[in-house]
Amino acid sequence: MVNSNFQFSYMLLDRLRQDCEYYLGFGGRCARQLWAHDEQAQINKMRELYDLVPEKPQWLTREQIDAYAKQMGVK
């Protein structure tokens, strides 16, 4: 069960994940399709939120975030 204090963080993290999927697919790798409008900023925010939430989501791992970063050409 999601801790209600972190509900927004989980929701935003999932939104960022979905943005990455779109960016890498039908979004044509256009940074303005991302929530952060910048690839590195998007990945940084995902890592920040992932580290913040006490219960890690089953639908996203740190390794997946790193894979998104690699596919997007950022660290």
Predicted regions and their residues:
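Generic structural signal of hydrophobic/aromatic residues within well-ordered alpha-helices
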Residues: 12, 46, 65-68
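N-terminal acidic leader/helix
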Residues: 1-33
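Short intrinsically disordered terminal tails
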Residues: 1-7, 57, 63, 67-75
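Acidic, low-complexity, intrinsically disordered interaction modules
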Residues: 20-62
